[in-house]
Structures are given as C-alpha cells and as structure tokens.
Curated annotation (Swiss-Prot):
Species of origin: Haemophilus influenzae (strain ATCC 51907 / DSM 11121 / KW20 / Rd)
Quaternary structure and interacting proteins, as annotated: Interacts transiently with the RNA polymerase catalytic core.
Segments of this protein annotated with the region Sigma-70 factor domain-3: 474-550
This protein's name: RNA polymerase sigma factor RpoD
GO molecular function: DNA binding; sigma factor activity
One of the protein's GO biological processes: DNA-templated transcription initiation
GO cellular component: cytoplasm
Matching PROSITE patterns: SIGMA70_1 (PS00715), SIGMA70_2 (PS00716)
Pfam families named in the record: Sigma70_ner, Sigma70_r1_1, Sigma70_r1_2, Sigma70_r2, Sigma70_r3, Sigma70_r4
Membrane recorded as keyword: no
Annotated region described as Sigma-70 factor domain-4, given as residue ranges: 563-616
Residue spans of biased composition, Acidic residues class: 187-228
UniProt DNA-binding residue ranges: 589-608
Top-rank taxon: Bacteria
C-alpha cells in the first residue's frame, strides 16, 4: 500500500515537473495542456485553484484559454523566472498532500519549512558569494549610467554637513581580495552558549531579555557605527567622486560607446562594487533604472497598439522596426508610403505615432542613453537583482528553524507565537543583508543577535495594551533589575528613594516610572471561584448619584414643599421663583416683579418677610436636620 502511494506521488511529481518545463519553454500554458498533463484524479477544485494561482503569481507563467501567436509575449513585462518556476514546482509537489490534512497555520508553516535542507559552512559561503555576485552585477551595470550615482554622492554631501547619517547610506565596504578568516573555535563557544541559554531557567531568560531591551536602542547603531570608519568612508567617497566626474567628462567628450568611455565606466564599476549600500539606498538605485525603462516600454506599447493591434502590421515587422530604429522617426514616412494593406490604416494615426516617438526621443535626451543602451543596462540590473534575491531567499529559508528555536523562548510575553516568528524573520532578513562571510563566522552565530533584537523590540513595542515608548521600556527593565538586586541585598522591597539613589535619577521620575510600569487589568476579570462577578462590579461609578444622596434630596424636596405650604400663596410663589424651586432656573427681582406687576423693591420686601417666617423655630427645625454638621 505504501509503495503504491509512493509510486503515485513520484508519478505526480514528474507530471508537475513536465508541466513547469513546458510553461518555462513556451512562456505560457493553456487550460487544455494542464488538463492533459495532470491525471484526472489530481484535479481537485481546491488544488486546481492553488495550481493556477502558483503558476501565474509565483512562477510568472500566464495561463491562457488558447495558444497565442508566436510573438505574443514580445513586450510583456512578465517573464518566467527560472528559480521562481523551480520554487513553484516544489510548492505544487507538496500542496496536494497538504490540502485537507491540516488548517493550522503553525503546522503548515513548520511542514513547509521542513522541506528545506540545513546549510553547511561551505553552503553558506557559496550562497553569500552568489548574493555578493548579484549585487556586484547590479552596481557594475548601474555604473554604466554614471548619472544614476548623483543622488548617492549628494546624500554623502549631506552626511558631511551633518544632515544625514552615514549608517543610513552604507553598511560598509568590501575588499574583494580579502581572504576568509577562520573562527571555528569561537563558533563552538557560541554554540555552547546557545545550548546553555536553551537550558537556563525563566528568570535568567528574563534578565537576558531585559539586558537586550536595555541596550537595543544603542546596539543597532553602535554595531553599524563601529564597522564604518568615517575617515575610510571619506576616502572611498572621494575616490568614487573623482572617478565619477572623470567618467562623465570622457562620455561628454568622446561619447558613451567609445573605448575611452568604456574603460572609465569599468574603473567606476570596480570602485562602486566596493560599496555596500543599505537596502533602501540600493532599492532606490534599482528603482530609478526600472522607472527609466518603464517609460520606454509604455511608449513602445502605445506604438504596438497602433501598428499591430489597430493597423494590422505583422509583429515580426514591428519588432524589427523598434529594435532597429529606437526613437528615430524616419521609418514612419516609408511605412506610410508602403503598398502593404496596413499602411493606409496608419495615416489616421500618424500624429500619435510621431508623439510616441517624440516621447522616446525626449527620454533619450534626458538620460543621454539610446533605447538599446537603456534596455541593455536595465536587463543587466534585473539579472543581477534576481540572482541576489534568489540567493537571499535560499539563505533565509534554510535558517527559518533558527527563528523558531529563538522565538520559543519568548512565548507568553504578550505576542502570539506566529507574530514572534514573523518579527524574528524580519530580523533574519536584516542579518542576510548585513552578513559578511569573509569574517569567518557561521551565519547562525551572526543572525542570532539580529533575530533576538527584532523579537525583543517587537515585544517592547507591541506587547502592552497601552503602548509605551521603547526607551521607557528600557528604563522600566533597568528599574526592575535593580529592584531585585536591592531585594536580595536588604531582604525587603526598596523604596523609591533608595531606587532613585541607586539609579542616579530624581525620585519623582522613579515614581513616574513605577506608575507607568503597572499593567492594565481588564474589568471583566472574574472575582472569586465562580464567574458570576467581575472586577468591574466592585468599581464605584462616579457618574451616578449615591442612593443615600438621592434619598436625602428627595426628603429635602418633600420637607421644602411642606414648609412652603405654611406661607401665603404669594410668598410661596415668590420664593419658588427666586430660588428656582420646581423650576428650570431661578429669577431676578426684576423678572419676579414683572410677573406680579410690582416693583423690584416690593418683591424684595415680600421675599424678606417670607424668609423671616421660615426662620421661626417652628418651621426651621424641619429643614435644619438636612444641614451638614
């Protein structure tokens, strides 16, 4: 039975590989080809949806109703990526057995993670070299367009002026001739420390976390700052600037295609390869090249729409014209005079054709590159970026287990396990970006700090119901650590005065930190063994009137009415209006006088007489009991 299942799985895997190979060769797949290659029992609706999604989104292979003409994909931006196709093949080989088995995201993540083999030291070096090679290809290709480096040099000018941090620009420099150092003994020490940490108790882990939190704000910057000598950076940037200026001058004088210009561009590329840019700066450079080519492709698609889709020009002819002429518009007149049937239909769109070609010419003028040169540079940048991205992905996927092992130590700290894994993976990706294999350490040794830093920072930033700034979290952790030390020394809880003296901080700030450190408690917290009562039931609602106050006010109202009944109707009404009894508001003497059609003085006299009557002991005794003693 097991052999049959294994044989079926192998057959299914082979069919998936055949399907992917066909899609990679053709650049597309049709629904008929998918149905023919896959066995009928494999086309489960849920799996079929996953198959189409993986083909189009992950592998970049479009799925069509019918086969297109041979040149349909000529100007398409979506080109199947060989590594993406291989990855999609692996996903599809696993997904059939996964569907219906479990929906737990953690188990699914663990299972997929387990399909990736661990790396040896040699594998790590090989992948790191591929990453470096891909980045070198990108930077060398960008050097062929020296104008792209203007922004980088301008940012360094801001660094010199103090308006920009050097660590926000570069992570360091690479010496291509440097040999790989050996630190095997130190790696073993690190491994021993990791084993000890895994077996340590929760208290030690808490202290570790607090120390990590305490230093995390400065560790990141210090780690980067110590690796970059400002004097070395100044020397390197000066060298880059001089070669950049020299290259532009030669291009301006002799043209970009000449041997002198190519030699200077090669020298510029060798210098620029030594720079390791931060990912944000690297992405900005790559994006600038992509945006440049995006404008060209847009105009070419406009021309294709007119010439091929509307006029009916054969695609072979269109591709030949665009490749040969670029922005040159001399071919338009010849095309309009052509005897071919599509030529007459072009006359109506002559202005739009010239407009698109003019836009291409403007792009060439702005960039000082021909369309062919732009395409060559951008293709080289894309190949290098793809190579580096694939290698980084391999390194990340092979070390996901390391993130899991570290994240397990930080459970029950306020974040869910999947959130801890996600934050740890972000730290892992940063470690891949900054890893320097020439220093001789294993990648796991280097990545552990970055993963812990990402996890502890996320706990400090997100775990609390009420967010507290990270610097305040550091102060709280330091205060807690010193409180435990004083408790061990004195055998009792330390007072705010003692904490302030030990920490060298004002006492009022210590009290403030102690107040902030308190965790909020839910009002739904159950009280007692049963769940009938909650904490909120025992908290006084200051917005409501107390029953005693309500009863007192009601009794006072009744007593006041009884006392007023002992006065004449006129006196009682005057007092009611003057003091707002049973009314929305009180009234002035003048307002009451108008009501009775008498003067203000007369109302004052009536009021005084009524109050004298109420002060008589026979009447005042009833109201005196309501006065607060």
């Amino acid at each position: 039975m097991e052999k049959n299942q294994q044989s079926t799985a192998e057959q299914y895997s082979e069919q998936i590989e055949q399907l992917m190979e066909l899609g990679r060769t053709q650049g597309y797949l049709t629904f008929a080809e998918i149905n023919d290659l896959l066995p009928e029992d494999a086309i489960d609706p849920e799996y079929y949806d996953k198959l189409l999604q993986t083909l189009q989104n992950d592998a970049g292979i479009p799925v069509l109703d019918e086969a297109p003409e041979s040149d349909d994909m000529m100007l398409s931006d979506t080109i199947p990526d060989e590594d993406a196709v291989e990855e999609a093949t692996q996903i599809l080989s696993n997904v059939e057995s996964e569907i219906g088995r479990t929906t737990d995201p953690v188990r699914m993540y663990m299972r997929e993670m387990g399909t990736v083999d661990l790396l040896t030291r040699e594998d790590e070096i090989s992948i790191a070299k591929r990453i470096e090679g891909g980045i070198d290809e990108v930077q060398t290709s960008i050097s062929a367009y020296p104008e792209a480096l203007n922004g980088l040099l301008k940012n360094y000018d801001d660094v010199e002026k103090g308006n920009f941090r050097l660590t926000d620009l570069i992570t360091g420099f690479v010496d291509p001739n440097a040999e790989i150092e050996e630190h095997n003994g130190l790696d073993e020490d690190f491994s021993d420390e990791d084993d000890e940490e895994e077996s340590s108790n929760a208290d030690v882990e808490d202290n570790e976390d607090e120390e990590d939190n305490e230093s995390e704000s400065t560790s990141d910057s210090s780690d980067s700052d110590n690796s970059i000598d400002p004097e070395v950076a100044r020397e390197k940037f000066q060298q880059l600037r001089e070669q950049h200026s020299k290259t532009l001058a030669v291009i301006e004088k002799h043209g970009r295609s000449g041997k002198r210009a190519q030699d200077q561009i090669a020298l510029l590329g060798e210098i620029f390869k030594q720079f390791r840019l931060v990912p944000k700066q690297f992405d900005l450079l790559v994006l600038s090249m992509k945006e440049m080519m995006k404008r060209v492709r847009y105009q070419e698609r406009q021309l294709q729409k007119i010439l091929v889709d509307i006029a009916g020009m054969p695609k072979d002819d269109f591709e030949k014209i665009i490749t040969t002429n670029g922005s040159n518009s001399e071919w338009v007149a010849k095309a309009l005079k052509s005897s071919k049937p599509w030529a007459k239909r072009l006359i109506k769109y002559e202005d739009r054709i010239y407009e698109a070609l003019n836009n291409l010419a403007i792009t060439e003028e702005n960039t000082k590159l021909t369309i062919t040169q732009m395409r060559d540079i951008c293709d080289a940048v894309a190949r290098g970026e793809q190579k580096a991205r694939r290698a980084k992905k391999e390194m990340v996927e092979a070390n996901l287990r390391l993130v899991i092992s570290i994240a397990k130590k930080y459970t029950n700290r306020g974040l869910q396990f999947l959130d801890l894994i996600q934050e740890g993976n972000i730290g892992l990706m940063k470690a891949v970006d900054k890893f320097e294999y020439r220093r001789g350490y294993k990648f796991s040794t280097y990545a552990t700090w970055w993963i812990r830093q990402a996890i502890t920072r996320s706990i400090a930033d997100q775990a609390r119901t009420i967010r507290i700034p990270v610097h305040m979290i550091e102060t709280i952790n330091k205060l807690n650590r010193i409180s435990r030390q004083l408790l061990q020394e004195m055998g009792r809880e330390a007072t705010p005065e003692e904490l302030a003296e030990r920490m060298g901080m004002p006492e009022d700030k210590i009290r403030k930190v102690l107040k902030i450190a308190k965790e909020p408690i839910s009002m739904e917290t159950p009280i007692g063994d049963d769940d009938d009562s909650h904490l909120g039931d025992f908290i006084e609602d200051s917005t409501l009137e107390l029953p005693l106050d309500s009863a007192t006010a009601q009794s006072l109202k009744v007593a006041t009415h009884e006392v007023l009944e002992g006065l004449t109707p006129r006196e009682a009404k005057v007092l009611r209006m003057r003091f707002g009894i049973d009314m929305n508001t009180d009234h002035t003497l003048e307002e009451v006088g108008k009501q009775f059609d008498v003067t203000r003085e007369r109302i004052r006299q009536i009021e005084a007489k009524a109050l004298r009557k109420l002060r008589h002991p026979s009447r005042s005794e009833t109201l005196r009991s309501f006065l607060d003693e």
